[in-house]
Design a protein with these regions (language model features):
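Core subunits and conserved enzymes of cellular information-processing
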Residues: 1-131
Length: 131
C-alpha cells in the first residue's frame, strides 16, 4: 500500500456512506494521532486501540445525530499525497470552510490541527481536511 492515510480516510468515508456504527482500521502511530484529533474535535464518538497481532487495529465509533441520522463528518479529504506533498507555513494555513472545518498537519512538534499550529507559529505537511 503506497498511502496508508488515504486508505484510512477511505475506510472511514465508506463506513459513513454505509451507515456503519463502528469501523476497524489497521493501526499506526500516525493513524492513532489523527483519530485522537478527530475525537477531540467531536467528529467521532469514541475510539479504541486493540492489540491483536503485530500491528493492532483501531476501532472507531462514528458519530451520528440521533434525530436526523446525519453524520458529524461531511467530508474527509486527503490533501498531501505521496506523489505531491503539500507543505504550508504558519502564516498561510489553509482555511477549511472559512474556519468551520479543520486541517490536520504533521509538524516537527507532532500531528495537530491548523489552529494549534498557527498558535505555535509552526508549519508542516497538510495531511487532510475534515468538515
Amino acid at each position: 500500500m503506497t498511502d496508508p492515510i488515504a486508505d484510512y480516510l477511505t475506510r472511514l468515508r465508506n463506513a459513513i456512506m454505509a451507515n456503519h456504527r463502528v469501523v476497524e482500521v489497521p493501526a499506526s502511530n500516525l493513524k492513532k494521532e489523527i483519530t485522537k484529533i478527530l475525537f477531540e474535535k467531536g467528529y467521532i464518538l469514541n475510539y479504541k486501540f486493540v492489540e491483536d497481532g503485530p500491528q493492532g487495529t483501531i476501532k472507531v465509533a462514528l458519530k451520528y445525530d440521533p434525530a436526523t441520522k446525519a453524520n458529524a463528518i461531511k467530508c474527509l479529504k486527503r490533501v498531501s499525497t505521496p506523489g505531491l506533498r503539500k507543505y504550508t507555513g504558519y502564516k498561510n494555513m489553509p482555511r477549511v470552510i472559512n474556519g468551520l472545518g479543520i486541517a490536520i498537519l504533521s509538524t516537527s512538534q507532532g500531528v495537530m490541527t491548523d489552529k494549534e499550529a498557527s498558535q505555535l507559529k509552526i508549519g508542516g505537511e497538510v495531511l487532510c481536511s475534515v468538515y
